[in-house]
Structures are given as C-alpha cells and as structure tokens.
Amino acid sequence: LYITTPYYAVEESMQKSLCIAADAGVDVRLLVPAIPDKKFAYVVAKTYWGELLAHGVKIYRYTPGFLHAKSVMVDREVALVGSTNMDYRTFQLHYECGVLFYHMPVVEELLEDLDDIMAQSSLYTLEEWNRRSWLERTFASVLRLGAIWL
C-alpha cells in the first residue's frame, strides 16, 4: 500500500487503519515532500508520523523538490490517482476527483514512477522523529489542535 500525498493530517480511523495494516504485515509506505509548500501543514503532518513509524510504516521524504502527487497503490495492481490529499479538508470539506485503475498498463507505469520517487527520497526513521527538539514537539502539538483547518 503506497500513498503519495503532499499533506497528511487524517482522522484517527484512517491513522489506525494504516497502523493495523502495517502490523498485519502489509508493506505500507507514505511518500511525502521533504520540502513543503505549507510549513504549518508539514509540521502538523509530522505529528502523525511517530505512530506510523512505530507500527512499521515506511515514510519516504522526496528530496529533489516539492512532491505534489496524490496517489494510492494497492497490491501493485490497483491505483487511484487524482486530486485527493490525505487530510481533513479533503475528506470533510472539498470535492475531489480521482481515477481508479485496475489491471491496466498505467498501473505498472505508476509503480515505476513511485519506485523512482522512493529512490530519490530519504527514508525517515523513528529515531529521527524522536530526536525532534522540545520546541518543535510543543509547537507541533499546538498546531495539531487546528489540523482540521490546515
């Protein structure tokens, strides 16, 4: 299960679902930008990463530039590509669109693109997440209270 999104701030049910999948042995990967366009949204996104990492989710931060792609790849044979971010605003407020591909050549092409993105990304670790400064942790916790508005 590969998820590509520039913004990550989800409801607890989605967060838990990804953790449960990883606990069950599913290869769950989150591909995000290392260079954000919205700093506060990025700080909030990182508050979710610790739990994901603790459950074995791999988080790749794309380093060459801003990654604005939005896709979900399931079992290397189903892909969803569209305008859907993984955040509250998308799921509760906005009308988004996407195209679902199943057993089509474009799925393999997307998989190749995702492999390229991961090759150009740095793997973020739980150790890195735990090394965040006290100031960053505090600031992020306060910002997360307003995650539904970011």
Over which residues does each language-model region extend?
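PLD/PLD-like phosphodiesterase catalytic module centered on the HKD motif
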Residues: 2-3, 7-150
